[in-house]
Curated annotation (Swiss-Prot):
PANTHER family per record: LIPID-A-DISACCHARIDE SYNTHASE (PTHR30372), LIPID-A-DISACCHARIDE SYNTHASE, MITOCHONDRIAL-RELATED (PTHR30372:SF4)
Signal peptide: none
Gene that specifies this protein: lpxB1
Keywords (A to Z) from UniProt: Glycosyltransferase, Lipid A biosynthesis, Lipid biosynthesis, Lipid metabolism, Transferase
Lineage: Bacteria, Pseudomonadati, Pseudomonadota, Gammaproteobacteria, Legionellales
Family named by the database record: Belongs to the LpxB family.
UniProt enzyme class: transferase
Record-given protein name: Lipid-A-disaccharide synthase 1
Function: Condensation of UDP-2,3-diacylglucosamine and 2,3-diacylglucosamine-1-phosphate to form lipid A disaccharide, a precursor of lipid A, a phosphorylated glycolipid that anchors the lipopolysaccharide to the outer membrane of the cell.
Length: 384
């Protein structure tokens, strides 16, 4: 009887860990003897993957924010290189996490000649530079989640398949506002704003003080206002709660459950990233925030070539949802916008209608195949 295939999967952040775990569950259901190892977090571990490193707890972004963790990332990189050399997997699956995974792809292809699938494309459409040439030289197949990404790779001569966006299916089964409030134990008849500062430590440190001050200003106008704060699994809950202590605010903290928190809210303030797209797909009135270190901001101004930061705005190619970035990310601007937004009933209606059209455009896009089918097609026949 032939040996089962070996697959190594690398997901360095919580969202990628979650998406990768869903793939592993599907693979294990059909190929129970498949040997899967790699880098991931609690979701991949729960799915039965043998982990050699967990980088999800060190979620950072930016030039200066990463410095304290360089030794950790270097060790993880050396460990996964050694693991690949020893295991010689039939397939290497890289999930998002481009700063780490593109370097790994270059090594795995050049030194080991491994077959590589890259799921969730680096934002080559946002960054100036020549990342796409590295991808063309290293990756056997790109599995992209936005239709326009397929065109970019096809034009560059990179093998690519559009596999659909994982959030579309996830959001389709989300609870409505009433059910979400009941599920979370929130009052049904009070105004609620969800505050989502991000899942990285640097995002917590920069965003939460601004969100606390914004909440205080909004509460001055509406003392009945309640806030709900979902806390990512990568963050110590006590650290988040400490910012809100003795602030005379009505706040409910929820471990995880970000989608339910957004669904339960009347309005959402969300850090740019995956959660902002989740919020858009929920058709929830919102605004997007982001603040980085000065050095990261200056570098971004030089390298980034897109007009918007929020994924929903990028997809719509217009400012559908307001973005409060860097120096504009402050409690004065935020509280002023939110107060004006709710004083005009036409503004929420208009935003909801635009978000509904965006959701429809993503939902109606026909995927070439599923990620599962793409992976299975690249596995040796010995798994059958």
């Amino acid at each position: 009887m032939p040996n089962a295939s070996r697959v190594v999967i690398v997901a360095g952040e919580e969202s990628g860990d979650h998406h990768a775990a869903e793939l592993v569950k599907q693979l294990k259901a059909v190929y129970p003897n498949l040997k899967i190892s790699g880098i991931g977090g609690k979701h991949l571990r729960a799915a039965g993957v043998h982990l050699i490193s967990d980088l999800t707890r060190y979620a950072v972004t930016g030039l200066t924010e990463i410095i304290p963790f360089l030794k950790i990332f270097h060790k993880a990189f050396q460990d996964i290189k050694q693991h690949l050399s020893t295991q010689k997997p039939d397939l290497l699956i890289l999930v998002d996490y481009p700063a780490f995974n593109l370097r790994l792809a270059k090594y795995a292809k050049k030194k080991l000649g491994l077959k590589i699938i890259y799921y969730i494309s680096p934002q080559i459409w946002a960054w100036k530079g020549k990342r796409i040439h590295l991808i063309k030289d290293s990756i056997d197949k790109m599995a992209v989640i936005f239709p326009f990404e397929k065109t970019i790779y096809e034009n560059a001569g990179v093998p690519v398949s559009f596999v659909g966006h994982p959030l579309v299916k996830k959001i389709a089964s989300a609870k409505d506002k009433h059910s979400s409030r009941t599920f979370l134990g929130l009052p049904l008849d009070e105004p609620i704003i969800a505050l989502l500062p991000g899942s990285r430590h640097s995002e917590i440190e920069r965003h939460i003080p601004i969100l606390v001050n914004t909440a205080k200003l909004l509460t001055l106008d509406n003392p009945k206002l309640r806030f709900v704060v979902p806390i990512a699994g990568t963050i110590n809950p006590d650290k988040v709660k400490a910012y809100f202590s003795n602030q005379n605010l009505t706040v409910t903290f929820i471990q995880g459950q970000a989608i339910e928190c957004m669904s339960a809210a009347d309005f959402v303030i969300v850090a740019s990233g995956t959660a902002s797209l989740e919020c858009a797909l929920l058709e929830k009135p919102m605004c997007i925030i982001y603040k980085s270190s000065f050095l990261t901001y200056v570098a971004a101004m030089y390298f980034i070539k897109v007009k918007f930061l929020g994924l929903c705005n990028l997809l719509a190619n217009k400012m559908m949802v307001p973005e409060f970035l860097q120096y504009d990310c402050n409690e004065i601007e935020l509280s002023r916008y939110i107060s004006n937004f709710h004083s005009d009933p036409n503004q929420p209606k208009s935003m909801i209608n635009q978000l509904a059209k965006l959701k429809e455009s993503l939902s109606s896009s026909q995927a070439d195949c599923s990620l599962f089918d793409l992976v299975v097609a690249e596995l040796p026949e010995k798994n059958a």
